[in-house]
């Protein structure tokens, strides 16, 4: 529901989970989360994205190309959705300096990866302006895929809140990698954030 005043509102963008092969942005179990933020004065945007793992086998340390492609597609779609909000921020009454991204499982991987790639000016970051950065990240059981070991940021990441169960069998709580290539989960990222005094 849009605020009828002219006051600009912070925005929460949410990316659903489902292993990059299923899920829906309007699933009933997400509605309380959306409503919580809407009542706090946020414009809530539930993002849809291409499901790149449909028809693919589960990723392994030696065969993760389909997963890498799926993450890239999701990040690209999140960037495109963000660009739309930036373009129409006036009409939507969104404060573009207060756009927070949040996601669950595959969605959490997407939002963490998106902020990581944006802060590092990676090739995927051609959709959004160089001057734009997300204001915050809320991750429910996410991680970052890296080919260079534990992810390092050229620009400090957005303030990030991690939620992750240590018994997670799908998204690694710590990390799952072969040599330096693999998925770095919430525990390893949180330790890195603490070491580097990231927010």
Could you tell me what each predicted segment is?
Residues 1-7:
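Short beta-strand-to-loop junctions in surface cap/lid or active-site-entrance loops
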Residues 19-22, 44, 84:
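Serine-hydrolase catalytic-loop signature spanning alpha/beta hydrolases and amidase-signature enzymes
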Residues 125-197:
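The feature captures the conserved acid-bearing segment of alpha/beta-hydrolase catalytic domains
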Residues 25-47, 54:
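Short amphipathic alpha-helix adjacent to the substrate-entry channel of hydrolases
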Residues 64-91:
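Alpha/beta-hydrolase active-site loop
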Residues 83-156:
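Primarily recognizes the serine-hydrolase "nucleophile elbow" in alpha/beta-hydrolase
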Residues 8-19:
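Short beta-strand element of the alpha/beta-hydrolase
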Residues 12-14, 44, 160:
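Hydrophobic beta-strand anchors of alpha/beta hydrolase catalytic cores
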């Amino acid at each position: 529901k849009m605020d009828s005043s002219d006051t600009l509102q912070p925005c929460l963008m949410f990316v659903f989970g489902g292993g990059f092969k299923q899920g829906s942005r309007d699933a009933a179990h997400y509605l309380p989360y959306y409503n919580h933020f809407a009542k706090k004065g946020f414009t809530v945007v539930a993002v849809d994205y291409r499901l790149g793992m449909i028809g693919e086998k589960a990723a392994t340390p030696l065969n993760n190309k389909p997963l890498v492609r799926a993450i890239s597609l999701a990040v690209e779609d999140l960037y495109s959705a963000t660009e739309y909000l930036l373009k129409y921020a006036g009409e939507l009454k969104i404060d573009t300096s207060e756009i927070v991204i949040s996601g669950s499982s595959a969605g959490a991987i997407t939002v963490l990866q998106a902020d990581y790639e944006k802060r590092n000016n990676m090739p995927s970051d051609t959709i959004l302006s160089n001057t734009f950065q997300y204001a915050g990240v809320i991750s429910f059981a996410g991680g970052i895929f890296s080919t260079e070991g534990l992810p390092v940021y050229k620009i400090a990441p957005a303030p990030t809140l991690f939620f992750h169960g240590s018994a997670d069998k799908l998204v690694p709580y710590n990390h799952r990698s072969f040599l330096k290539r693999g998925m770095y989960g919430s525990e390893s990222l949180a330790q890195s954030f603490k070491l580097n005094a990231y927010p």
